[in-house]
Amino acid sequence: MTVQPLSRESVEKTVEPIILDCLRRFGDFSKPGIAAEEFAKLVEGELRPDVRRISLLVCLAQSATGPDSKGEGLELGCGYGYLLLPMAVFNPHIRWTAVEHPSRNYFNRAEFRQTLQDHNCQLVGCNITHEPLPFPDAKFSVLTFSETLEHLPVERLNFVLDEISRVIRPGGLLIASSPNQASLENRLRLLKGNSILDLPNPLPTAKDTFPHIRLYTPSEMSQLMQVRGFSLVSCVLESNNSTYRDVGRKSFRKTLYRLYELAEQRLPSLRRFGDTWFMVFRKNK
């Protein structure tokens, strides 16, 4: 029997309440104990970029692995569980392990750990920029690495990618996403004389973690993984960041960004200017 691929729309309907719940319960800036209804109204419409990002990553994973795939999965930099929990829901036969920096506020919270356990996910603490991943070689059949690359100090990039390569088994998958250095937004910022990066100062919410200190293009990521014995399976570029523009939900600037995103979805020639790239690599056997 042929299994129909998941529709993006159906995945979005599943992941949105998961993301909303994770942010409400574990977010660094969320009011402790806030009711679900109150929080939903507070962030109404603001989670669209995350919902779109996670839904696309889930669809790419399903396309590359199939719905009945088995084995060990690893997420580097699990954050509040935005991606980890949906991956566990849509890939129930994969045993997921999450790696997170142990200084994050939610890392030792019993509620956070219990939520991961309820989804059959294990949590491991590791400062990935300075410590080897605490796993044997070739352990994982799939590894997700979303919105983490851009936070890495440049001098530690090769160390982290070498560790990623080490723990993925031959034939295994790396599913990654990161802001696109060559996006239209970044080009416009540079033309205005503005920087596209944050200063490399540690984040106040966790020791030895950083904001966006280096962005990469899809071609750079391809080169970085090719020299480590990976082949590109698929690459998608997409913009979903109009939600973040201006304060008013109906502002003119925000409307222009939304119109551009709609145009980008319909004109393939514009997609190379997308805000975020999504790439799937397979480790050569």
Q: Where are the regions a protein language model picked out?
A:
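A short acidic, Gly/Pro-enriched loop at the edge of an enzyme's catalytic core
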Residues: 131-143
